[in-house]
Amino acid sequence: YKKRIENFKNNPIGYDKIVLLGNSITEGGGDWNKKLNAENVVNRGISGDITDGILNRLEEIVYFRPIAVFLLIGINDIFNSDKPEQDKVTVKYVANNIIEIADRIKSKSPKTQVYIQTVLPINRELFFESAGYFPEHKIPLNIQIIEINKIIKNIASQRNHQFLNLHTAFIDDKGRLSSEYTTDGVHLNDNGYSLWAELLIKHIRVLNNN
C-alpha cells in the first residue's frame, strides 16, 4: 500500500485526466489506456484498498480536478467483515462510504463527472478452490453485494452521480461471478478486463469528445 502511494507521489495524475479509482481489481487492469483506446486514463487502484482508504487518499485525486472518476470499491470492506473488530462494517456503512467518496469528489471538483460502478459479484466455490479457505459470513457475500448496489443506485441519481451497473454483465446463472471472467472467484482474468473495458469505452469516448 505504502509503495503504491509512494509511486503515485512520484507519478502525479496531471490535468485533463480520467481516473480509475479502486482496489486490486482496478490496479490489476494495468495500463488502462491500452484497454480503453485512450491516452489520458490514470490507474489509481490499490490492492487491498477499502472505502475508508479511498476517503483518506482523495486529496490527490481532487487536486488535479479530473474530467471524470470511475469508482469501483467495497468488496474488501465486506470480505472480512464478520471479524469481531469489524462490527461497524455493514452493508449500509460501505454503501454510505461509496456515496461519500463520490460526494467529496464532486464538492471539491464540481466539474468532475463521477461514475459509481457496482461492486462485482464473487464466486465462493472458485475462491475456495484457489485459496483453500473462504471467510464465514452470516449474510452471504453476494447478497451483501446486491444490497450495496441497490443502495448506491438509489442515492447516485439523487446526487447527480453517474451509475454504472457492471454486476449484471459478470454474473453466471447462479448469480455468482462467472468462471469465464475470473482467475480465483474475486479477481478478473483477461476476459473479465476485456468485458469491463467494453462497458467503459463508450463513456470514455464521450468524455474525451466533449
Q: Residue ranges of each PLM-predicted region?
A:
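Alpha-helical cap/lid subdomain in secreted, periplasmic
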Residues: 34-39, 55-210
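Serine-esterase "nucleophile elbow" of acetyl-processing enzymes
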Residues: 1-70
